[in-house]
Amino acid sequence: MKYSFAISAGNSAMVQMEDYLNFLIDDSNTKVIALYLEGVKNPHKFEACLQKAMEKKKPVVILKAGRSPKGQATAASHTGSMAGSDKTYDAVFEKFGVIRADDMQDLRSTASLLATLRVLPRKPAFSAMCLSGGETAVSADTGFLHGIEYPDFSEATLKKLNDMLPDFATPRNPLDMTAALCYDADAFSSGITTVMSDPSIEMGLVGLTISDKVTVSNDIMFEGIRRAFEQIPDKPLAVMSFMEAARNKELVERFQNAGIPVLPTTKYGFRALQHLQDFILHDTIKCEARLAIPEAHSANTRALSEYESKKLLADNGVPVDLGYIAKTKAEVKEYAEKIGYPLVMKVESNDILHKSDVGGVMLNIKSLEQAEEAYDKILANAAQHAPNAKINGILMQKMLKAGTEMIIGLNSDPQFGPMLLVGMGGVFVEVFKDAALYPVPLNHDEALHMLQALKSFKLLNGYRGNPPADIEALTDMMVKISDFAYRKKDTLKELDMNPLFVYPKGEGVAIADALAVMYEEEK
């Protein structure tokens, strides 16, 4: 791999990482930026850099320290940068198409692949071509584990391959080219060219064992790959080395100089291809390429009651049923007649955030008698379990019909601003941690992308006879909540909407409960 610059930033006391990044994005001799990052000192500059890299389609590959608590502590003490939440960095990187490397070898392998490729594939559609059945099977399995797309060959391609391969070979993608082709550069080149000419294939991967101990066919393989590479100028080729430790370094250099990257081992090779695939797919999503970076705010916070939280949402364009706060039995009767049955009644208090824990919620109330009993019981429970809480009254609302339970939340990162979280309710988010996190603001494409990232997305799409959920209404709700968070980026700390019911397609969504925590102004 060739370098335009190799920069050691030290402790970044004078020139910061964001300054180097900005310079390298503008530098025409730098094709790919590989960066070790401990933290960000200037989030506004960092945002501007990522926006520019995205506009120029210049890949940025980052090895970010701080996946563990000790890693975060070490990074913070080293440079004084804010390490920040690791998941927040993942979300910011995803928004701007930044590739996050797992370790130093992954950083190098991915940067080398992107820097050496003559052109990038137009879409993620790969073919792996190997010289043995074992290597072909490994390529198929490892590619599958990394989500690599292997399209089927066309009938025309299959016919051509059948004509050139031995009778015992069965052409498919990934392709076992058999050892018969590696002793003839013309035959080897013809096999690769046939595959690369298939309209469904955008990039080829040739698996080789280029060991110092097996050199008989090295020149033939190099020449065959080079010829194919020249015949298909609009599609990239890469070589996968199956034996990294003993590979022929001279041959690797010949490939690299010809513009054909050599990927080290299947582990790092397919991980680099996965990064490449993600980078290409990022272009297919229309992104709001900006963040909601907050100004400095007070350390003091105040939790809003459910009614106050919902009122805040309603005032900012988020559809929600406010209900009524009853402070007397007479008001219970008045509001019950206005709302209609069945009802839900809840304790309304800024001091009781988890109402169910104190017996402060009564569901499915079907008559005035039950409503009056619920009023008395909720007040008694609150007095018993939260005697010091100030009670504002009893919140009365229409009982929502059951739907698919989702959770939507917001949490404001001190550097990058509000992050929107979405996941299935209940055990999916609590036990399986099946949730997606993404920076505000977001649009409908990004909201849908978040939902599709959930392991449980199939449940929303209709599963085993259940109707598909109203995904359009759900993404619309996510965008409205994102817009709200963007407007309140300087004052909002947290927002939790759990549960949010999603109904069948065409029937909408409904927020059942909401809790907002706001930063208080300095006095």
Regions found by a protein language model. Name each.
Residues M1-K523:
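Catalytic-core regions of core metabolic enzymes
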